[in-house]
A protein has these predicted regions:
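Conserved short histidine dyad/triad with adjacent acidic residue
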Residues: 43-57, 103-106
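Mixed-charge, glycine-accented linear interaction segment located at domain edges/termini
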Residues: 134-138, 142
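Glycine- and acidic-residue-biased ligand/ion/polar-headgroup-sensing regions
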Residues: 59-76
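Asparagine-centered strand-capping/turn motif at beta-strand->loop junctions
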Residues: 110-115
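Polybasic, low-complexity association/targeting segments
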Residues: 1-15
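Short acidic-glycine-tyrosine-enriched beta hairpin
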Residues: 63, 78-108
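A short glycine-rich, His/Asp/Glu-containing loop-to-beta-strand
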Residues: 20-49
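A short hydrophobic beta-strand segment most commonly corresponding to one strand
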Residues: 63-65, 116-131
């Protein structure tokens, strides 16, 4: 997956102009491709300044690469005894950065655009294309102490 995401991230003509359009409401998903057997979907996410995902694990495996702009990723660890996610660290994810994780609570994170300019990321999920908005994120509660 790392090699495929790196190759895609290096392709400056990967996205059509319409696939780079965001939304003022929240980050916007553009389905780029999906396996006919429902094994994976490839999605571009467009993030305007200030937009962020909820804190979440994943119902399916996933990977992503940053295509343009910079996102901030906060990683969390799951505290089974509290039933909450606890923040571990935050780092910037610049163009070309790649990450991937298995399904479950071992890869809890939050992505967001803290910068002033639009950012675009490319995601590959282990779900059918029509399930991207409902079967990917496993939103969790966060410990604030």
């Amino acid at each position: 997956m790392r090699a495929a995401l790196a190759e895609a991230a290096a392709n400056e003509t990967l996205l059509a102009p319409a696939q780079c359009e965001g939304s003022s409401e929240c980050y916007r998903r553009h389905l780029l491709a999906a396996d006919a057997s429902g094994r994976y979907a490839v999605v571009a996410l467009v993030w305007h300044a200030g937009q962020a995902s909820p804190v979440h694990g994943h119902h399916a495996w996933c990977g992503y690469a940053i295509l343009s702009g910079t996102l901030t990723e906060t990683l969390y660890r799951w505290d089974e005894s509290l039933g909450l996610a606890k923040p571990v660290r935050t780092h910037a994810r610049a163009p070309g950065a790649i990450s991937y994780t298995r399904a479950g609570l071992g890869g809890i994170h939050r992505l967001g655009n803290a910068g002033p300019a639009r950012a675009i990321s490319l995601h590959v999920y282990g779900v059918a294309g029509d399930e991207v908005s409902t079967r990917v994120n496993d939103v969790v509660r966060v410990s604030h102490r």
